[in-house]
A protein has these predicted regions:
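A beta-strand signature from Gram-negative outer-membrane beta-barrel systems
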Residues: 3-43
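Transmembrane beta-strands of outer-membrane beta-barrel pores
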Residues: 47-51, 125-129, 188-195, 252-258, ...
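Transmembrane beta-barrel wall of Gram-negative outer-membrane proteins
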Residues: 88-198, 228-230, 241, 437-439
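Signature of Gram-negative outer-membrane beta-barrel scaffolds
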Residues: 191-193, 290, 310-311, 315-448, ...
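Outer-membrane beta-barrel signature, preferentially recognizing the C-terminal barrel domain
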Residues: 212-235, 373-386, 430, 459-516, ...
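Surface-exposed extracellular loop regions of Gram-negative outer-membrane beta-barrel proteins
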Residues: 358-368, 447-492, 511-549, 642-656, ...
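Gram-negative outer-membrane beta-barrel transporters
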Residues: 513-515, 533-649
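C-terminal beta-signal and adjacent terminal beta-strands/loops
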Residues: 518, 645-653, 675-740
Length: 740
């Protein structure tokens, strides 16, 4: 959103009965502003450059001829696709020097009819280039003895992407009188994400005897992701009489996503150590090619009603509140792919040159000319939520109490195009009901001091696609849905102290406790792990088959902590600081590989269960931020420096004892400086990530091959680094111009 459209950002640490219950971590509410009393017309222009592309090129591919629909969608379900139905330009890659980033926005607003009606309109455009490098080491194989990780590959990736964002925002408001007003807000935003990835995949298990050897796959992936969202919200505030007020809101939203002709061109070779110590390289041969179309559409209709009845009881103000919510959401997902097999042109395969010289079997067409639409990724799903609440608010001179209860009913269902006689995942449904009581106290200790206490229940509802049988490989591992996923339910306690010492100076301190039943986490499964508790080919469960990421419920978790924040100004200099400590813990049975007879090293390896105690996935014990602000209104200079620290946390959980992926702590910094040239114009400079922050993810296992170079990218012997991502700074210069 352009900043001129935002009136304020509201952060709620706890919930009252009128708020939706799906908010274990609290609520952030973006309040948009109405048209101001005076005319508004502002322009902002910004340009910048990513340091990544100063020393490294941008990997580009052609997008003009990408077909937005697959042959199945264009010609119908009985059409036999041929090679001429597929462009080759999106698999022709070249290195270029990208143009600078370009960002712009324009805002106009005005009031009419004696200030009763107002309109504010904004448009924005962004063309941003991004680049990064990383490596990733998956543990796709079952762990070895004593849970030594089953590392299989070393992926070295270089990403280049262009993000083109467009947005149009409008807000109309009309004040009938001081007690009655309506507003209509509309938002349309679109994103085109054009991404290329160059990857070198070196096997750590096939032919890897010394550094520089092993089976190697080289691939270039082209992926265009198109997204757009439209939302229209109509709302009204009405003071019916001195006691009764009514608020209502209805919202209609549509979101579309499309991956058209997402493809990856790859070839394979091998570097094998010879008996004399030399290394021989085999010819580079073309690998099979898959071309994917994936699209989805979500439609959401929501209606809210809030009734407040106020009356006086002795020296207190009593407010009785009631209301409800109805939401209907529908999601339609479509997935299709075509598989091309290389033609055999030599006794070893087909030597690879480029996409224009590649030859495929089936007359250069796909092996499955009808496509592959009958899969769990082609489905329709719906979600219906009904909610109601009742609360009492009692306000005295010092204390304010709010107590009440909220109920929510949820009904989710899906049906896919899977043939039920061939596979699982045809259809399913989930229904549940929640009662969410809450109580809050706000006590005014003095004019400058406030004490707040609250207790409430909340929930976390899985996304609609997470409870289907979808299975898509977005990156170096599969992502799968989980229809057996349960919602999380939390009991929350919170105590907070606030001190307002004048001006913008604030100190806040608090403690909190949460008990979370059925928390769900992002878990990485290796090929043999259970994906679903459904019998499959003689097994009592369905195995993942490949490295797979899936949302899973964990045992009941307990989390508690403290937080403190402060804002203090010393003349022109301001300091903003905050710190949060969180302790979270779950105990769960994990698998461990050991000998059937520990005293006999030749006995069979078997899996046993060990209890493991660890934090929740994604929960860092330490979060800290520090901001330095400088403002000189006389000279027109403003500057800011902000740092955010995130402590170590579990990046991805594992069902194997001691094999969670741990992300190291990291610090991110941003800096900016602004100069006011006159009453209507400002220029600014901004730099993001000047520290060249690197993201490191480790297995907390000793590194037996450290020093031998068999696993690249390692810097320590006491752990195994499985992911390292590097992004360089981005520099921006811009202009803010108020034309009125």
């Amino acid at each position: 959103f352009p900043a001129d459209l935002v009136q304020r950002i509201e952060v709620y640490k706890n919930l009252t009965p009128d708020m939706e219950g799906d908010a274990i971590g609290g609520v952030v509410n973006l309040v948009m502003r109405n048209a101001p009393p005076d005319k508004l017309f502002k322009i902002s222009l910004t340009s910048g450059y990513n340091q990544t592309f100063v020393n490294k090129p941008y990997l580009s591919f052609g997008t003009n001829d990408i077909r937005k629909r697959s042959p199945y969608e264009i010609h119908g379900p009985n059409y036999q696709a041929t090679g001429s139905d597929f462009t080759k330009d999106n698999l022709s890659f070249r290195n270029i020097q990208p143009l600078p980033d370009a960002l712009g926005s324009i805002v106009w607003g005005q009031r009419f009819f004696h200030q009763k009606a107002g309109i504010i309109v904004a448009a924005d455009y962004q063309d941003i280039k991004r680049g990064s490098t990383d490596f990733f080491i998956p543990q796709n194989n079952q762990p070895q003895e004593n849970n030594a990780p089953g590392l299989t590959d070393f992926y070295l990736n270089r990403y280049s992407s262009t993000l083109i964002r467009e947005g149009l925002h409008s807000r109309l408001d009309y004040d009938f009188n001081p007690g009655n007003a309506i507003t209509l807000s509309q938002i349309y935003v679109s994103l085109k994400d054009i991404e290329s990835r160059h990857q070198i995949d070196t096997s750590l298990t096939q032919g890897r005897t010394i550094p520089g050897t092993g089976r190697i796959n080289i691939s270039d992936r082209s992926r265009e992701h198109l997204q757009n969202i439209y939302n229209a919200t109509l709302q009204g505030n009405h003071q019916v009489n001195a006691h009764l007020s009514v608020k209502w809101r209805t919202a209609w939203s549509v979101a579309n996503g499309l991956y058209p002709d997402w493809a990856e061109l790859s070839s394979g070779t091998a570097r094998i150590q010879q008996p004399d110590g030399s290394v021989a390289t085999s010819p580079l041969l073309l690998n099979p090619l898959t071309r994917n179309w994936l699209r989805n559409r979500e439609r959401d209709i929501s209606t809210y009603l809030y009734l407040d009845y106020r009356l006086s009881v002795k020296d207190h103000e009593l407010t009785l509140s009631a209301g409800g919510l109805y939401r209907n959401k529908e999601r339609n997902n479509f997935y299709n792919d075509y598989i091309f097999q290389p033609a055999i042109t030599t006794n070893q395969g087909q030597p690879f040159t480029d996409i224009y010289h590649a030859q495929w079997t089936n007359v250069n067409g796909p092996q499955n000319p009808l496509g592959a639409v009958a899969n769990p990724n082609t489905y329709s799903a719906r979600e219906n939520i009904n909610a109601g609440y009742f609360s009492l608010k009692l306000k005295g001179q010092k204390a304010e109490w709010i107590a009440g209860i909220r109920y929510e009913t949820t009904n989710q269902a899906y049906i896919s195009s899977v043939d039920p006689t061939v596979s699982y995942g045809k259809q399913g449904s989930i229904r549940y009901f929640d009662l969410l009581p809450s109580i809050q106290l706000k006590y005014q200790i003095s004019d400058q001091q406030i004490l707040r206490a609250s207790g409430y229940e909340s929930l976390s509802r899985p996304a609609l696609y997470d409870v289907t049988f979808y299975s898509v490989q977005y990156e170096d591992y599969q992502e799968a849905g989980n229809p057996f996923l349960r919602r999380s339910h939390a009991d929350n306690l919170d105590l907070r102290y606030e001190l307002y010492s004048g001006g913008l100076n604030v100190i806040q301190a608090g403690v909190f406790y949460k008990r979370i039943a059925d928390p769900y986490e992002r878990t990485l499964l290796n090929a043999g792990d259970e994906l679903y508790p459904i019998p499959y080919q003689g097994l009592s469960y369905t195995p993942a088959g490949v490295l797979t990421s899936q949302m899973r419920n964990a045992p009941t978790a307990n989390a508690c902590g403290l937080e403190i924040s402060a804002v203090r100004y010393f003349g022109r200099l301001g300091i903003q600081a905050g710190y949060t400590y969180t302790y979270s813990n779950i105990n769960l049975p994990d698998k461990f590989i050991t000998r059937e007879d520990p005293a006999n090293p030749s006995s069979n390896l078997i899996p046993v269960t060990r209890n493991e105690s660890r934090p929740l996935q994604g929960q860092s014990p330490h979060l800290a931020n520090l901001g330095l602000l400088y403002a000189d209104n006389l000279s027109g200079w403003n500057a800011s420096l902000s740092c955010t620290y995130t402590g170590k946390r579990i990046y991805s959980a594992s069902g194997w004892y001691g094999l969670d992926y741990w992300q190291r702590g990291y610090t991110i910094m941003d800096a900016s400086v602004e100069k006011k040239l006159n009453k209507k114009m400002k220029v600014f400079l901004k730099v993001t990530n000047p520290l060249n922050t690197t993201i490191d993810v480790d297995l907390h296992k000793s590194n037996p091959s450290y020093g031998q170079g068999l696993i690249p990218g390692q810097r320590r012997s006491d752990l195994i680094t499985v992911l390292r991502q590097t992004e360089l700074p981005v520099y921006y210069v811009g202009l803010h111009w108020n034309l009125l």
